[in-house]
Amino acid sequence: MTETLAGLNPEQAEAVQTTNGPMLIMAGAGSGKTKVLTCRIAHLLQQGVRPYRILAITFTNKAAAEMRARVDNMAGAAAKDVWLFTFHAFCARFLRMEITKLGGYGSNFAIYDSSDSQNLIKQILKELNLDEKRFQPAGIASRISNAKNQLQSVSDFSKAASDFYNQKVAEIYERYQNKLLVNNAVST
C-alpha cells in the first residue's frame, strides 16, 4: 500500500485511496494525472478489485502505453485484464463486443473514416448518375453524419426530404447504409 502512495501529495493520495465508484481526474499537463491513475489502479487491484472491472481511458496512444507500462510494473500479472485504452480504442473494442446486436454486422467490421465515406458516396453518385458538383461528396457525408448523430434513421430522413435535392440525399443515405452493411463497415 505504501508503495502505491509514495511520492503523492495529500490530494493525489486521497484520489488513489478513494475506491467507491468512478473517478474523473482533471488537471493540467505535468501535474501527475498518469501517476495518480496508475497508483489508483494498483491500489484497487491490491484491494481485490477484479482487473476486468477497472476501466481507464486516456486521450493519446502515448499516454495509454505509458499508463499500461506503469500499471504492469506496479501490479504485475494482476494488471493484465485491466481495461486501459484511448477513447477510440475503447469505443472500437466495445463495438466489436456488441456489434452483433445491431444485426448483420460481424465483429471484424471496418470503421470508415471521412475519406472512405466520401469514396463510397462518389460510387453511389455514379450509380445514380448524379453530378458531384451539385451533390458534393463531403457535403453529403456531413449531412449523413449529422443525421446519424441526431439518431435520424434513413426512413425519418427520407420523410423529412421536401425537395428534389433532399430526396436525392435521402436516397444516397439509404444506399450508403446498405453498402456499409454489405461491406461490414460502420461510419459516423
Question: What do the PLM-derived regions correspond to, one by one?
Answer:
Residues T2, N20-G21, A42-T188:
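A basic/glycine-biased coupling hinge at the interface between accessory DNA-binding modules
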Residues T2-G7, K33, L37, H43:
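Conserved RecA-like helicase ATPase core segment
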Residues A6-Q17:
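Pre-Walker A adenine-sensing motif
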Residues E11, C39, L120:
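Short Gly/charged-rich anion-binding patches and loops
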Residues A15, A27-A29, A56, A63-A64:
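Small-residue (primarily alanine) positions within well-ordered alpha-helices
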Residues N20-C39:
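Walker A/P-loop
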